[in-house]
UniProtKB/Swiss-Prot annotation:
The protein, known as: Heterogeneous nuclear ribonucleoprotein K homolog
Subunit comment: Interacts with alg-1; the interaction is direct and may be strengthened through RNA-protein association.
Keywords associated with the record: Cytoplasm, Nucleus, Repeat, RNA-binding, RNA-mediated gene silencing
Biological role: RNA-binding protein which functions together with alg-1, a component of the miRNA loading complex, to modulate the processing and activity of specific miRNAs such as miR-58 and let-7 to regulate gene expression at the post-transcriptional level during embryonic, hypodermal and neuronal development. Promotes the lsy-6-mediated repression of cog-1 in uterine cells. In embryos, may play a role in the DNA damage response.
Biased composition range(s): Low complexity: 224-241
Entries under CDD domains matching the protein: KH-I_HNRNPK_rpt1, KH-I_HNRNPK_rpt2, KH-I_HNRNPK_rpt3
Pfam family, one: KH_1
SUPFAM superfamilies recorded: Eukaryotic type KH-domain (KH-domain type I) (SSF54791)
A GO BP entry: embryo development ending in birth or egg hatching
Predominant location: nucleus
Length: 397
């Protein structure tokens, strides 16, 4: 969700497939594209409640809603809470939960196992949460002191992306680890934020209006196989992002994967060089000032974003990398599920050749520049999050 909870997008690549029937409820259908007139967070606090907004994949949104809206109606009735997932034929949607703090946590405990956003062996649970940009600064603290305290207290990974979601004043907080630890982070965040009024204007993120696949690595959104050349539904460019946090500079990549048929060993030089490829990815930002880089967070080292998808078009090229043969199963996954997921999320064609008794296997990646970057990053994370990868290369994500 964003809580934003991370979700894998399987079978929801086309706008038609991603657009569910209006099974949220009648209210969602009639009001799903209305821009909110009030600040829901402040209104909830005034009523003694708390509003949590989760960024979830379209597939996970379907799991929250359930067939015919059955599950979302159950949540509302069982917990006497406001739960809403407005329609949007984009790869991501926003799930809003409003209730007292204890009830919010109970709803999340109910919902998290249903989500399909999590695929890391290391982190069985991952959540993405939308927070106002002024709250993001408070949660990071001076020189990163507050966010470090939260990580240590709850024994969970935690990151806040530097960029605002398109057309909004929202930033994405992402946390992962054991479910109880993730819920602990969320509980601590609620305790902190209920005492801090929002500063400045508040413009909530509305994926139906503003989703922009070219910016997902900047704000922490979900990739999807959108039509080349721009956002879905021919809406044109997303509006200018309001109140965006300080941008990071582009991050260059090492050359562990070469294009045009060349090969390079997965183990050549530093393991992290696996990120190599056709050059810097636009918007793949480093950490903001006051947010110290730290190995052991989400995404690439130094907080350089969290995944990025197919994006726009461009010339199709090929990249190759060799990996130790015994890591092939780690990339393929049970029944081919893991490599299928990477193909789905990156939009690239990925072929893993047979080892034929050789110590190394060749992975061929074909697609646009951004698709190749996305596939490289997801493959790297797949290996680094696996038990074999950690044993071989050391360290943690």
């Amino acid at each position: 969700m964003m809580i934003k909870v991370g979700a894998a997008i399987n079978g929801t690549d086309s706008p038609k497939a991603m657009k569910r029937e209006h099974d949220n409820d009648d209210g969602d259908r009639t009001g799903r594209h209305k821009r909110p007139k009030t600040d829901g967070f402040t209104e909830a606090i005034q009523q003694g409640k708390f509003e949590v907004r989760l960024l979830v994949s379209s597939k996970s949104a379907g799991a929250i809603i359930g067939k015919g809206g059955e599950n979302i109606k159950r949540l509302r009735a069982e917990f006497n809470a406001h739960v809403q997932v407005p329609d949007s034929n984009t790869p991501e949607r926003v799930c809003t939960v409003t209730a007292d703090e204890k009830t919010v946590l109970n709803i999340l405990k109910d919902v998290l196992p249903r989500l399909e956003d999590n695929f890391s062996e290391r982190d069985p649970c991952e959540v993405r949460m939308l927070v106002h940009q002024s709250h993001a600064g408070a949660l990071i603290g001076r020189n990163g002191s507050k966010i470090k305290e939260l990580r240590e207290k709850c024994s969970a990974r935690l990151k806040i992306f530097t960029g605002c979601a398109p057309g909004s004043t929202d930033r994405v907080l992402i946390t992962s680890g054991e479910q109880k630890n993730v819920l602990g982070i969320i509980e601590e965040v609620m305790k902190e934020l209920k005492e801090i009024p929002i500063k400045g204007s508040a413009t909530p993120y509305l994926p139906a209006f503003n989703y922009d696949p070219s910016n997902i690595s900047d704000y922490g959104g979900f990739p999807g196989n959108m039509p080349a050349g721009g956002p879905p539904n021919n809406r044109g460019p997303a509006p200018q992002r309001g109140g965006q946090g300080p941008p990071g500079g582009p991050r260059s990549y090492g050359g562990a994967i070469t294009q045009g048929g060349g090969q390079r060993s997965f183990e050549a030089g530093d393991f992290q060089q696996f990120r190599g490829g056709p050059g810097p990815v636009p918007g793949y930002a480093m950490s903001a000032p006051g947010y110290p880089p730290q190995q052991g967070q989400f995404g690439a080292p130094n907080n350089a974003g969290y995944g990025y998808g197919p994006g726009g078009g461009g010339p199709v090229t090929t990249a190759q990398v060799t990996i130790p043969s015994d890591l092939g199963g780690t990339i393929i996954g049970r029944g081919g599920e893991r490599i299928a997921r990477i193909r789905q999320e990156s939009g690239a064609q990925i072929t893993l050749e047979q080892s034929n008794g050789q110590p190394e296997r060749i992975i061929t990646i074909k697609g646009t520049e951004q698709q190749i970057h996305s596939a490289q990053y997801l493959l790297q994370q797949c290996v680094r999050n696996s038990t074999q990868g950690r044993e071989r290369f050391g360290g943690s994500v």
